[in-house]
Amino acid sequence: LNPFEHPRAWRQKIVDNVKLTPKIRFDGKGFICALITSRCPVGCEHCMFFSNMSEGKNSVNTMTESRVTSLMRLVHDSNTGYLLVSGGGEGFLEPDLMYQIVEKTSADVTWLVTAAHWARDKKRAREVIRKMYDAFLRGEHKDHGRKICLRVSLDSQHVQRIALPNKNQLQYIVDLIRIFETEYPNEHSFVLMVHSLEGEEALVNDLCKAVSGEKLARHDPLHDNIKFTESAFTIKLESGYEFEVTFAKLLLSDLAADLRDKETLKKRVELFDKDAFRNARGNPAVNYNVDGTIGTDMLVIYNGRVAGGWQSEMPDVPINLDFDDFQSIMQKTLSDPGVLGTIENGLAYRFNIIQEVCPKAVLRSKAVNVRDYSSPVLLEEDKIKLYYSIRVLQDFIAQSRIKKNELEGWPKEIQLLTGMTRLELQSLYLSARYDIVQQFIESSHRFDGFFQCVKKYARERKPDAIIEFFESNPNISRRTVDEWRLLLKRIVNGWYDLCTLNEQEIKSVEEIEAILDERVLAGKRIFEGLSFQ
């Protein structure tokens, strides 16, 4: 049997039977980016997480109190110095969870990212900040030299959607600044930051004028030596109160980026490569500290999923706050050849191996243009997971990282695969009659029935068959339908090498995607691509 026609089972053999010993040692402060919810009431068109309110609150799209408790334990046990509570969605949709984080965090610096839609009402803004401050005091952070930073996103789209009519469009931001200026002027551990985008300098200048501020070079940069920002400065008010303004690049994010649009694709790849290989030193799973030590760099998602190595995870290994602590997270992360190979050798190593059999996978992982999606997109196909794992094992064997008795203890099938030449593996991979569609048929409930509707539509061009299928299967969630819609969109945009669809069927996919979008989902976007476990 060709293992690449049953890649999930063969990859599982590796996960179950091969346990590696890492060389890398994390001896310094770590970094965690935590997404509290996928939901956001603002709905900016440029949102790199495509956040909206199409789905009601549930345990898949929003953290629970117990998950936040587990997150705080992870922050402590992983020696995390820097905690970024980010989008995803708008964390302050769940203010009690944010106050819980403020009180319980043990990180040296904790940023709370917000669009600040809640600041349109100044009374409400004052109440939210006061509750944050009370939580800050309960946490005794001043006694430990820790900082809490409210980081407000400021750009034209946020302002357009949040500003109240008949008011200065920046009034809600001005109100926040005045609250910090008048009520917390001497709190150097409880601070405000404004975060904007390159190209929005005029808007930030307008804000500076609105608060009668003066722009200064940064002299107490909160981000320096932690995470790279494109540029920054400080605004000083007449009262002497100061806050930092940082800028980042606008990403060309798209969950179904069109690989056929070569001009835009080139820009997207350049943006990704700059961030990955200059800003993150080619290894985003490692947090490099100024004292020369290294720490872990993790991503934690609202449904509890944890990437123990940021942009380096293998999507088929479940790691979750609901059942994993720091020790088990790192054990699962560093014993998996697919993850350890990336963490120890960097992103370029992984890209080069996958390029041997599927250049499209490399392109699409960069073209999505959101770093949190790079591993799930790159390694979406089970065939690629298996190929990469085998090639990493071959390199570990060549480097004498695996003892003879360990190798002999592996299943014979794995020994056979790792003993093949690269050309033999490539030949097996490319000859396998298995693609992303077959993968969905095997792994997604009722997709096989939907796939038959796709084939029927390609022959008859009658939308009713699609509609009737979903009417007769009401238990298929809208989240699942949206995931299938996204798959079709990606097929249209040239993401995959396909063997289960003929040319006529591929041509009909765009029409079927439109039917799902307009007639089944009514334009709602629910599946966000990160909560896949």
Residue ranges, per PLM feature:
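Conserved glycine-rich "GG(E/T)P / GGGxP" loop and the immediately following alpha-helix
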Residues: F31-T37, M48-L203
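Accessory C-terminal segments flanking Radical SAM cores
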Residues: K227-E381, Y388-S389
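Extended non-globular C-terminal regions
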Residues: I353-S531
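Secreted/processed peptides and extracellular or luminal domains of membrane proteins
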Residues: H46, F50-M53, P318, D325
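Class I S-adenosyl-L-methionine
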Residues: P165-Q169, H195, N205-C208, K236, ...
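Classical nucleotidyltransferase
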Residues: I148-D291, I301
